[in-house]
Amino acid sequence: MSTGELKANAREQLRGYWAVAVGTVLVTTILIDSGALYTVSEYFDMAEIGISCNLIALFLGGVISTGLCKFLLDIVTKGQEPKFKTLFSQFNIYLKTLGLNIIIYLSIAIGYILFIIPGIIISLMFSQAYYILAEDNSKSINQCLSESVEMMKGYKWDLFCLELSFIGWWIIVALTFGIASLWVSPYVKVTETNFYLNIKNK
């Protein structure tokens, strides 16, 4: 499936669900996007807030990311009615999501320390792990990571190009001081979910 088809599907799938998608992705960003929150902390010149934001992202990032993936899968597959509360549905496997988040975070961080390209490659390799766990909570951390790596063989460049295709939209986000991200972020996330299902079924 081409990038254009993935995006077209996302727009169609979001029809009727924009409100709940915007709210869910916005809360996700507030809770785990430490970069955005750190910018706020710098504005108030309070370094301790920045540290707190990073800790929140570390300890909540895994469980919220897995919940978001489950929510996004509900939108795309129409298996269940997408609900905001799904974002918080994965606390029953909190320790597993925490371990997964820490391993991914440290692996990507080490990759970026060594050089930017290894960091990008590692992030692409592990990009499907949360989706895998969201679909099957019984899978171990190692299974989620290894299946993501295997799934992304031959598709890392495709995902990289897919992300690049949203540059125009992110420029609009910047020009609107972030307001447009309310609509752009759900659009991107649902498109990424379509990408996951597309390569999973091959």
Language model segments and positions:
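Hydrophobic alpha-helical membrane segments
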Residues: M1-K202
